[in-house]
Regions:
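Active-site anion/phosphate-binding pocket segments in diverse small-molecule metabolic enzymes
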Residues: 1-16, 67, 86, 93, ...
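Active-site-proximal beta-alpha core segment in soluble small-molecule metabolic enzymes
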Residues: 2-17, 27-199, 212
């Protein structure tokens, strides 16, 4: 039972509509890999995966074997790619649960092959090309050839794809992205023609059609937060709501919260909400962020506490005890987007969506699929 109103509300219909919009812009020949790592960017991995499937996604991307296993155990049968580097201990699960594994070293192929022999099954892999991100992947044609050589010696391990990741597709200068694209294309030429090639993250999906290849990998865009300007009708899929638990008046000269960083210059009405950095509401929002009350923006006063935050409701008569407060999302004609909340907090929309802690339960709208 929840004894205070403080929850995230995920609109699964928004997820479906966003996936349809992305899929529709790509055309029938380009698949959509729904990136659902990190609990679907804080939206709930399994429910989002089901909604994405309903809307036309055909593949899933996760970061770890544990995430892939969770999808399998909840009945997701579509291909799942693990983006992270394979460790020897992860080979058993990759084969057992039929998870496609990213590879970039010959020893990874050998680990999977050993598990194929033990389990009497095949393993599937995608080759990662480090074209400029600087994380994992082969960097040269020679390194890619070493992977192909290892695959020839391990017939149970099947190469089904190759991919790269752009470091700055949302940046103003396109030269580096195009350089990465050329590196990927050069290495791809020695790979079998039948495999899936994919490179486009959300930004590249929206800005660089030449990067679409056989499949695109929308992550943040699927959740309604496009990282670049677009005419595509993408809408945020999550709201974070709470309520006012106390209202008081303060006089000129009164201070608010720890460190007394806010001092009133006049008579004010101040509301307290039961949310703080212990819930994942960024402390950097202190004296900077705003919430929505009665459809209007109410500035945060003083420091965000661990469990409570105070806001200025002087000019908002609807601000009474029990009134809804929106930390993220729309209320009336106004909206606080993940990008806006991130800007106030000095961070990015991704972190905003992932920030809420276990004290902030999640509920869902439009779970029923309405075609």
């Amino acid at each position: 039972m929840q004894y205070r109103k403080n929850q995230r509300v995920v609109d699964l219909q928004a997820i479906r509509e966003n996936v349809r919009a992305l899929k529709g812009a790509m055309g029938e020949s380009v698949q959509v890999m729904a990136v659902v790592k990190a609990d679907a960017y804080g939206h709930g991995m399994v429910k989002v995966a089901r909604a994405a499937l309903q809307a036309g996604a055909t593949y899933f991307g996760v970061a770890t074997p544990d995430e892939g296993i969770q999808l399998r155990e909840d009945g997701i049968k579509a291909p799942i790619l693990i983006f992270g580097a394979l460790g020897k201990d992860g080979a058993e699960a990759a084969v057992r649960y039929e998870l496609t594994q990213t590879v970039c070293r010959a020893e990874m192929i050998e680990w999977l092959y050993e598990e194929c022999r033990l389990q009497g099954k095949e393993a599937f892999v995608h080759l990662k090309v480090d074209s400029g991100m600087g994380r994992i992947g082969v960097r040269t044609v020679e390194e890619a050839q070493s992977i192909l050589n290892a695959l020839k010696k391990c017939p149970g391990v099947k190469l089904t794809g190759a991919f790269t990741h752009f470091a700055d597709a949302d940046g103003e200068m396109e030269a580096f992205t195009l350089k990465q694209l050329k590196i990927f294309e050069d290495i791809s030429r020695i790979l079998p023609g039948s495999i899936l090639r994919h490179a486009a993250n959300s930004a590249a999906t929206l800005r660089y059609p030449q990067t679409h290849f056989d499949m695109v990998r929308p992550g943040i865009a699927m959740y309604g937060c496009p990282p670049v300007k677009t005419v595509m009708p993408l809408r945020p899929a999550q709201r974070w709501v709470t309520e006012i638990v106390h209202v008081k008046k303060i006089e000129s000269g009164d201070t608010v919260s720890y460190g007394r960083t806010f001092t009133s210059q006049h008579l004010m009405r101040v509301a307290t909400i039961p949310v703080g950095y212990g819930d994942g509401y960024h402390r950097m929002l202190s004296n900077r962020g705003k919430v929505l009350v009665g459809g209007r923006l109410a500035p945060i006063l003083g420091r965000v506490c661990m469990d409570q935050t105070m806001v200025d409701v002087t000019d908002i008569p609807e601000a009474v005890i029990g009134a809804e407060v929106v930390l993220l999302g729309r209320q009336g004609e106004n909206e606080i987007t993940p990008d806006q909340l991130g800007a106030w907090a000095g961070t990015i929309s991704y972190e905003v969506l992932l920030a809420p802690t276990m004290r902030v339960p999640r509920s869902y709208e439009h779970e029923e699929y309405d075609q």
